[in-house]
Design a protein with these regions (language model features):
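Conserved phosphotransfer cores of two-component systems
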Residues: 109
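Alpha-helix capping/helix-boundary segments
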Residues: 100-101
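Gly/Gly-Pro- and Ser/Thr-rich, intrinsically disordered tail segments characteristic of DNA damage-repair
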Residues: 77, 112-123
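Glycine-rich, positively charged N-terminal anion/phosphate-binding segment
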Residues: 38-55
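Short beta-strand elements of ligand-binding domains
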Residues: 65-66, 96, 116-118
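Surface-exposed amphipathic alpha-helical tracts and adjacent flexible/coil segments at the periphery
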Residues: 1-11, 16-22, 27-30, 34, ...
Length: 417
């Protein structure tokens, strides 16, 4: 049996961190308010980070903080101050791409482990060994590596140097995520946390001798999403991932909702545990894993580079829209006197049938019986996003349960290929 892997889940906020922890993460990675390459994510204040780390550690879950900016000179003083603050709240590791930032981390907080981000283009065992000699304890493999290449890596690096690999989520069209399109089109630097995702826009080809004549690609007169990748999904290949010697299975998505994080964490948790317990049970349950994971809000799936270089089926040429099966309504907070406190995320009404998604076990269909606002006034619906409400359901819910509503599918979902 292969080694027991870590399940590493993203979190965009304190609420999502707690969701990841409760729904099965072994470790969570988060970003602060600077230097983490997710300027549009909610990110964590130092106070939220401190609370999140304490919550995770109380549940025996680790927390890694991203500092994977490709720094300019002007960034370095702020990086130093940031690491001085992080030293006090004791995350389990820093995720770093820039050698200059790495050196500052070694100097300021040597007791915190240093992981090398995929942004550093980690494609060969020479690179892994270099970072090991510098003091890194883990390297995140480039998304461009195949399983065979990862096996070769494992055989040529120290046993105590960990390999972390993205196994699920969005794929960047650029090499190891180092995109220049956003900076070129909008002046917002993807390598400094401000990507505008131009890979999801439509494009047409122009031949230099025919200015003004826009040539459609794949016969789409409005252009094509030629840079628009499907999402990575490797849940049906857990055995292959573990046999390759991967230590940490990483889920992409530091800008995703709590519903997405709960669904992916719970499903991958069960898949890993099933395989470790009984490989035959895992094989039997693969259709269930795929059904559950496809209920999130995301695109069609691909296996990326794991089994060789992707072909044209990896791209989505006609759309950048998301497949959607469930609408996220909120997370159950305190439960008292039969009322669930929630901060509502999407509209729902009295009399509707919704689902309670639990960390363990089956989902439960319930009726919304009553809705009260913070003043105790009864209302028929929850129309305002982020309104704090107290909701009576036809069956009991527990703190950290997810409330969601099933929607009619607009299209047939494509599962892993």
């Amino acid at each position: 049996m292969a080694r027991h892997p870590e399940l590493l889940i993203p979190a965009s906020s304190l609420e999502v961190l707690k969701t990841a922890v409760i729904f099965g993460a072994d470790a969570v990675y988060i970003g602060g308010e600077a230097f983490g390459l997710r300027a549009k994510a909610k990110n964590f204040s130092m106070e939220d980070m401190k609370e999140g780390i304490a919550f995770a550690h109380a549940h025996d879950v680790k927390v890694y903080v991203t500092a994977n900016i490709l720094a300019h000179n002007e960034d370095l003083p702020g990086v130093r101050k940031y690491f001085e603050e992080l030293r006090e709240i004791k995350p389990d590791a820093l995720i770093i791409a820039d050698p200059g930032v790495f050196e500052i981390a070694k100097e300021v907080c040597p007791e915190i482990e240093r992981h090398i981000s995929t942004q550093a283009n980690n494609t060969n065992y020479g690179t892994y060994n270099f970072w090991y000699r510098q003091g890194a304890s883990r390297v995140v493999s480039a998304r461009e590596l195949s399983l065979e290449e990862i096996k070769e890596l494992r055989a040529n690096i120290p046993e105590d140097l960990e390999i972390e690999t993205f196994v699920h989520g969005a794929m960047c069209i650029s090499y190891s995520g180092r995109c220049l399109l956003s900076n070129y089109f909008t002046g917002r630097d993807a390598n400094r946390g401000a990507c505008t995702h131009p890979c999801r826009w439509k494009y047409a080809v122009v031949e230099e001798k025919r200015p003004g004549e826009y040539l459609p690609v794949y016969e789409n007169e409005r252009g094509t999403y030629i840079f628009n990748s499907k999402d990575l999904c490797m849940i049906q290949y857990i055995p292959e991932l573990l046999e390759a010697g991967i230590d940490s299975l990483k889920i992409e998505g530091r800008m995703k909702t709590a519903l997405y994080v709960a669904t992916v964490a719970r499903t991958y948790r069960k898949a890993i545990d099933d395989y470790q317990k009984d490989p035959e049970l895992y094989k039997k349950n693969v259709p269930w894993y795929l059904e559950q994971i496809s209920n999130c809000t995301y695109r069609q799936f691909t296996t990326g580079f794991f089994f060789g270089k992707p072909d044209e089926t990896t791209q989505i040429y006609d759309s950048n829209t998301y497949v959607k099966e469930y609408t996220y309504l909120g997370i159950v907070g305190e439960v008292k006197d039969g009322l669930c406190r929630i901060e509502q995320r999407n509209k729902f009404s009295v009399g509707e049938t919704i689902e309670i998604m639990k960390p363990n076990g089956e989902n439960v269909e319930v009726q919304v019986e009553k809705i009260f606002n913070e003043d105790g006034e009864e209302q028929e619906s929850a129309p305002h996003s982020k309104q704090v409400l107290y909701v009576a359901l036809s069956q009991d819910a527990q703190q950290y349960d997810i409330l969601r509503r099933a929607e009619k599918a607009d299209e047939t979902k494509a599962l892993c290929e």
